[in-house]
Amino acid sequence: MTPVIQTEIAFKPCDLLNTRYEGWLADRLEINVEKRLLKLDLDMILEPFVNRPGKQWWAGEHVGKYLHAATHAWRFTQDERLASDMKSVVKRLIDTQLSNGYLGTYKESDQFRQGDGLNWDGPVWDVWTHKYNLIGLLSYYKTMRYEP
């Protein structure tokens, strides 16, 4: 059945790879790349994965957030330094994945369970880290056509 009233599509996504930014927005994008993404201590955000549970067992989402932001920034800038950093982070992150597929920061006794091993009996947010890892890795994969 055809609707009585035809709706018009109000939103059409733009082609971000072929969009050129100028002025204030272009300046902000460049500052974000130069002053944040290229300056971020990548060893620090990978440390909780390399040395589970790390200094802060709850701080694992930053790698995924970095990859998501850096991938989108790269789409605008095509900055090869950023591409190189992202490639390194992806490889290093994937290298920390356990044989059972686990890609988080918690020690084995706390993975997807209650408690944190430090006398805390409440829920742990292990899924939080995985969520952001997947968002970041999928953003990277889609844009950079990553093949393991």
Language-model features: locations:
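Glycan-recognition and catalytic cores of secretory/periplasmic carbohydrate-active enzymes
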Residues: 1-148
